[in-house]
């Protein structure tokens, strides 16, 4: 499989649209977690003007340049919804502008690699606060297969995520069933001391049983 090397800055561009007309309000304000997802903001928004806030439109990325005290991860997310969010003007918002060469979903897969977190931390600079700047982001080398191959990787990745989420939902359902069964037993069965159902096993006995 042939790979072509690019500087990431050749494939992405900053997005600096602001909420000048106050079209978006407090419910649209988002933060970003180190799990690389958008979350509800934890900031106190009382009296804060939302005009300087950046728009994160569908398929846009946003990240926080400060990497210190982040658990060795960079705070970055990809808006995969059909909604527009707004984020603090201290964030950097960008999108893929060479969609003929790079799929945004493939780029987000790349960002989710532990190697990218290590790279961004290693290339962060500063004294009081270390930052991974936009210039540092753009200077990063990335090797890409064809768009068709990228799409295949994305499809496999999404299928794996769907399987994982289905498995986790199954565990949640099983837990609910077990909890309901135990609660039902508590109501129907008399309480007993468990002493007659258990016994202490010494180390010697354990070895003998093994």
Model-derived regions, located:
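Non-catalytic DNA-recognition/assembly elements of restriction-modification systems
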Residues: 1-19, 141-203
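Low-complexity, Lys/Gly-biased intrinsically disordered segments
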Residues: 1-44, 49-52, 65-66, 70-72, ...
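A short beta-sheet element
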Residues: 58, 62-112
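Short amphipathic beta-strand starts and helix->beta connectors
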Residues: 77-79, 123-126
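A short glycine-rich beta-alpha junction/loop motif
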Residues: 84-90, 125-151
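Internal, well-ordered alpha/beta segment that forms a basic, Gly-enriched binding/recognition surface
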Residues: 116
